[in-house]
Amino acid sequence: MQTIAILGSTGSIGTQALELVRLHPEEFRVVALTARSSREKLFEQVREFRPEVAGLTEPIPMSEIPEDVRFCRWVMGKEALRVAAAEVPADMVLVSVVGIAGLQSVMDALGANRQVLLANKEALVTGGHLVMDAAKRIGKPILPVDSEHSAIFQCLQDEIGRASCRERV
């Protein structure tokens, strides 16, 4: 069973990832969920997937967290992304947070030897060489999950199935 931390779980890509987990519970277990501010949606996800850690990057007082979701560790602020990316034992970290915050999350995950599933182009635009060097150092490629990024990634591979995607020079 693969464990996954989902940073940005209440957004479009995060909810799609959770749908895959829902369809394949024997293959995946969610260990961390984070969101920016969609707390009600995050509370619902925590109830269903029962992660070890949950967090909001826009902090709220613990008194505003419902009793029935306090079974997991709650982390607030930027620390939520770091804890979910690097502290919680996870095989994979899906980084689907918006903007430059994604770069630090990617670097934290790679620093903890995690497989990064990337849905944040800003991380590569602003720190591409840092990200790719870190991925190379741990021997794990960055796997794009956004549709456009994934299409480009697939076309740059030597082979997909039996068909070659690019000419060899």
Segments from the language model and where they lie:
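N-terminal Rossmann-like dinucleotide-binding module
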Residues: 1-54
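A short helix->loop->beta-strand "cap" motif at the edges of active sites that frequently abuts
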Residues: 2, 50-52, 70-72, 112-115, ...
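Short acidic-hydrophobic, aromatic-tinged amphipathic segments that line or gate anion-handling sites
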Residues: 55-57, 73-80
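Rossmann-fold NAD(P)-binding glycine/threonine-rich loop
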Residues: 65, 100-112, 121-141
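Beta-loop-alpha module in the N-terminal Rossmann-like domain of NAD(P)-dependent dehydrogenases
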Residues: 76-109
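Residue-level detector of conserved catalytic or cofactor/ligand-binding positions
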Residues: 159-169
